[in-house]
Curated annotation (Swiss-Prot):
Protein known as: Putative gene 55 protein
Superkingdom field: Viruses
Name of the gene encoding the protein in the UniProt record: 55
Amino acid sequence: MFKLLTLFKRNKITSAEEYYTQAIHICEQFDRSTQKYTSM
């Protein structure tokens, strides 16, 4: 979970919409790499 927060800070998310879009994108990447994060 801390890695996700680090990604958000590094990508300089400014608005709630960007934050949401970024979260979906990151979760999709997790879905492809490991099936453990599908429920996020």
